[in-house]
Amino acid sequence: MKFYIVAAALFLTFGVSAQSSLKGKIKDEQGQPIYGVNIHISELQKGTTSDENGGFILKNIKEGSFKVTFSMVGFKTEIRKIAFTQNNTVEILQTLKEDSESLSEVVVSASRRSEYLSEIPASITVVNQKQLTDLSNSTTNINEILEFTVPGLAVSTGTFSNWGQTLRGRSLLVMIDGVPQSTPLRNGQLGIKSVSPNDISRVEVIKGATSIFGNGGNGGFINYITKKPNANEKIEGTTNIWGASNLTKTKDAFGFGAYQSLRGKIDKFNYYVSGSYEETGNKYDADGKVILPTYGLDNTRIYTALAKLEYEISDRQKISIGGNLYNSLQDTPFIPVLGSFEVYNENGDYTLIPGHGIEGSIEGQEPTGSKLYNGNLKYDLNSIFDGTTDFKADVYYQKTKNIFFYSDKFENGGQSVINAKKYGLRPNFNTTLTPNESTEISLTYGLDLLKDKTNQGLLDGRLWVPNIDMFSWAQYIQSTVKLNDEWVLKAGLRYDDMNLTIDDYNTLPYSPLGDGNFNPSVAVEGGKLGFDNLAFNAGVRYIKHQEFIPYVSYSQGFSIADLGSVLRSAKADSVEDIQLEPAVTKNYEFGFLSKFKNFRLEAVGYYSVSNLGTGVAFDENINSFVPSKKPQNIYGGEIAIDYTAFDSKLQVGTSYSYVEGLTHNVGDENNLTYLGGDVIAAPKLTAYVTWVPTNKISTSLRMTNLGDRNRFNPYLDANDNYTFRHTQFPVEGYTLLNWSMNYKLQENISVSLAVNNLLNEYYLPARSQWAAPLRTFTGTGEGTNAKLSMLYNF
């Protein structure tokens, strides 16, 4: 802590000498600001980088004429000789031209500082705004967009739930602009579908164990970076309207939506506001049957709003305030008819009959879905401590309300709801040092303070998961050393300290398997629980040759098991008797990136171990969820290839993801068993081809293929019938084709048409299969459906 006290004192008392400054903005040839440009005066060993608005300031420059270098991957380097006089500020506007010989790279900021993608020793997928716009022509469901674009992410469940949509077989943390949306204290696993794709400028997916943002990142994290108030005029905007329908059967299947955004710059103020409304109709499978409505996407109303306001206090200071809401509520006219299955023999031959919906209603059931609210206040101060350091701090508030479907697993039935509130404060420093021309050292360090209040009850007032009140604080430091523009070395530490207070409560009678076997109510005395964890990461990447950019890395992540699931089925008399500790995940990774003029290849292999397993496991002997005590070993690989030809008029690409996992009892490493489908996804293959015959027309064909996964043998239950255990049902693969076309009516007006499941494939999403023993989730996927939309920019 002494380090931070000293840093804070320096921050409050820093001063500068009476010397010159260089201030400016950097733009591309279209006049758009460029983020992350290196500005360096080698003779003075001074440097900085441009901010999100392309602005920069370099202070304490002595009198004289010096060469200033402006460089960034994907742009031609510019060198200007500038004369400085004492006590003077030189202002410039610098334009950089794209380098046709180099592939432009996205700057990644999810790791708390801007970094080049090819210089990070880790596996990262960035879904840029163009990809989001193109794929949004087909769907507004972000789960399906990420399913196609992110190798290593399991396929979508076809619902608004992401239970089973793991990242490399591990749980993931979902964030919006760095603010956590997941509810790890009682993980409802609805976090991925938490924002409108229209409001996203890019998605950053960091894979492998990570603790850079704390609890929950065993498999990595997804960070939605929302659009910023960057504009050249007082008012600019985008209008998007669309209609969609199932084509297999059209009865009440029509849906529609509208989105409007406005942005602008007025003096020192920048603003961005948006709102959208969407309604979906009935959903039918390839045979024209109503899709199972549980967690469904049918008959859903979605409201979204986003607002950001920035004020430039000075050349180096900026304050911004923002917030967003996302309400997605399903009010379906259908009730579920649950699926069923029969296993015939010890070989595992089976018949699986999926569930579906029939007209009807459940008395008292409220609409299901999510209500999310975010608010944040940010302060930026650049070029302090002799121009070497940028300081950022943000205060945020996040509220989640997840409303689940009616279930007869509760005594007398009921509908549960997760309520979570988070309050956070995060001061962060980024320091860049250039001891010589061949060495650049970057340090990121700061504090995370978090208050999280979570519970889960029933809408009728019964409490299922007691009030959990957590306060955590963490300190971290991440270092990067760049040597001779050839090597990037990275290492970091994060220490977390968590303290939880849990109220006294009584467990609810509950039947986890829905078989009428209700656990009795237990009175549990509340108390306090404490956890701490020190996580380490290190990596190295060789960046000299674009044709082969290899890396190797090691990282750790940690999470508290889904504490709410444990508490609601507790057998102990006191929470202090529950043996619970963080699950620590260690991730080993090797990969490389190869880039040629028109060709890009990325491949990675990984091995991940967790000494306690992750999450919770179902114990059939006591009919309850318990903390997982079995170590898990997960391994896999990913490959992605992209190629462009004919002046980028033809674009083709493919990716393949494979993951497998094993577990064993503590002390019995030789008796290995496979992990279930809720953890390990079946292999995934994607491919696309995009053709742009003219400047006005583009068309794409995309394929998603899910492979088979059949790792488990059936067993005889108490009635001498063959069956499969929880999450161990075989998965049978399928292939989906989606087509879309975009046509520019004018430079600022375009229309698009998309057809999903082009061949009307009858299929069951992976979760509908491996979770078949639960019956609740076994539904079919949607048949052929279409979306027609129009986009207008002004």
Which residues make up each language-model segment?
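C-terminal beta-signal and adjacent terminal beta-strands/loops
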Residues: Y4, F558, F646, V652, ...
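Short acidic/polar hinge/loop motifs at secondary-structure boundaries
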Residues: K59, E144, V179-K207, Q260
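Extracytoplasmic beta-strand/coil segments of soluble accessory domains associated
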Residues: N143-T183
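A beta-strand signature from Gram-negative outer-membrane beta-barrel systems
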Residues: P197-T238, N793
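Gram-negative outer-membrane beta-barrel transporters
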Residues: N240, L450, D485, N598-R600, ...
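Transmembrane beta-barrel wall of Gram-negative outer-membrane proteins
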Residues: K251-T280, D285, K289-P333, P435, ...
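Flexible loop and strand-edge segments within Gram-negative outer membrane beta-barrel domains
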Residues: T280-N282, G296-I302, R316-K378, N382-I384, ...
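Structural signature of Gram-negative outer-membrane beta-barrels, strongest in the C-terminal barrel
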Residues: S314, E440-T444, D448-L450, L463-S610, ...
